[in-house]
Amino acid sequence: PAGDEVVLIYEVTGKVVRPGGLPIESGVAVFNVETIYNVWRAMNQQTPVVDKLVSVVAEVEHPVTVRVPIGTTIEEVVALAGGTTVKDPVYFIGGPMMGFIGSGSQPVTKTTNAVLVLPQDHYLVKRKRSKSSIDMKRAAACCCQCSMCTDLCPRHLLGHPIQPHLFMRAATCKDVQQPNIFINTFFCCSCGVCELYSC
């Protein structure tokens, strides 16, 4: 994921943030462009953060990135993109990997950056609505321990001790002999590579 600061730090500087560590411990601070702009406005124009850049894409008339006041509803933001092109849309707040399903009455907050307008039957909507208990049963039935999920895990690739395939084996078999397998899942960045792309 391009927005994962731990991966970004490695790609730009070659430094690896230790598992569970903070970027500043590696002598690095990561800010996005909008944050830097907001700091500049606060310091030079004495303007607090009262608006947000939001991209509205997918099933809309005119995909657009707009600056809207914080507190604007998602439906109002989607209207600025010409409205939806599907009946009964699902508003997916954030990106496809780490986003969540929101509602039209939900307000834009300081962390809102994108709205994906999707149909009810879209794969991302189905994935977010699925129950974790069903996901675990499905994984237990089909996981062949190929370790592709671990091979593609961005945190594992940086040397962090997370191994999704071993977690799946331990979780589905209810094997608690090696507690570190479970503890190491705290280093997961929730990007979804293991479940959405590798498996």
Regions flagged by a language model, labelled:
Residues 51-53, 63, 88, 112, ...:
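Active-site lining segments that contact anionic ligands and/or coordinate catalytic metals
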Residues 1-74, 80-87, 95:
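Hydrophobic alpha-helical positions that pack around
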Residues 118-140, 150, 155-199:
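Ferredoxin-type iron-sulfur electron-transfer modules in oxidoreductases and energy-metabolism complexes
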Residues 55, 65-67, 76, 92, ...:
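Structured core elements
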Residues 26-30, 64-69, 130-144, 158:
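A short glycine-/small-residue-rich loop at the edge of a beta-strand within enzyme catalytic domains
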Residues 2-4, 62-63, 75-76, 85, ...:
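Flexible loop/turn segments at secondary-structure boundaries
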Residues 7-12, 44-46, 88-147:
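Active-site gating/interface segments in enzymes
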